[in-house]
Amino acid sequence: MISSVVQSRDSKRENSLWLRKGQLMDYLERTGRVFDVQRYSIHDGPGIRTIVFLKGCVLRCRWCCNPESQEYKIQTMKVLGEDKVIGRDVTVREMIEEVECDRPYYYRSGGGMTLSGGECLCQPEFARDLLRAAKERGINTAIESMACAPWENIEMILPYLDLYLMDIKHTDPIKHKEFTGKSNELMMENARKVALSKMTKLVIRVPVIPTFNDTVEEIQNIARFAATLPGVEKIHLLPYHRLGQDKYEGLGRKYLMEGIEPPSPEHMITLKKAVHAVCGLDCQIGG
């Protein structure tokens, strides 16, 4: 009995270590790259949350409101005429200590930590270990992601994930590639795999973008797909906005959605009704 207890304890310790340059390292010392931390958020998951924004993304969505997230490298962006460094390297330990500062708010509101980006799965080991650190401290976990990653990168985070907020932007692979730079087959396949795993709660989110996917037919096609995913009960429609437009100028880039107006509240209600017309999912505007 004593031997089995010791073996179990040793096994847990081995699982908390990883190899770096020939040395075993505690997983809390793993380093990742973030570009922002937003505290007291009431979006992107239940309750009051801390959103950790990770650097790097494989898509180049025309409407992206965080263009400074796309490159993994640390950048300089003009903000109000001043140079601002975008990106910093942190360990899991440093980041979780920052997240834990707001534990009382999580406790009272049912909130927690959400990983966003960019695409947090571009740093899969760091994302996994940060989620693990939160779970081991009793903090609710969520990610905001479009699942454009190898399945093994997604599978490794699921044991530590309470909520997956997954973007599905379009069902047409050609139009998806035209507006984001990549086709959608991998993302839709991964959505099915996450749903079938039953390891986390899955919510489908749709950025509603004029000229891209804002017709009744396009939204209904996404809703029909979402309704085929086992366990999925909710779909969020997120109206396009231009809050990140100035960032493109600060990065010396052209904003490709110039002149495109956000969808009206009336049109968003029409799309919500269109979802309800074809499936039984709970549909909400915003999220």
Each model region followed by its residue ranges:
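Glycine-centered flexibility sites
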Residues: G45-G47, G56, W63-C64, G87, ...
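Auxiliary Fe-S-binding modules of radical SAM enzymes
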Residues: M1-H43, P210-G287
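Short alpha-helix boundary/capping motifs
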Residues: T76, L80, D162-L163, I204, ...
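Short alpha-helical interface patches
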Residues: G81-K84, R93-E100, P265-H276
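Conserved AdoMet/S-adenosylmethionine-binding subsite of the radical SAM
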Residues: I96-G250
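N-terminal [4Fe-4S]-dependent radical SAM core
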Residues: M1-T91, C101-S109
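A general alpha-helical scaffold signature found inside nucleotide-binding enzyme cores
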Residues: V90, K182-E189, E266, T270
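Short glycine-enriched, charge-decorated loop/helix-capping segments at active-site entrances
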Residues: G81-V85, K177-S183, G252-I260
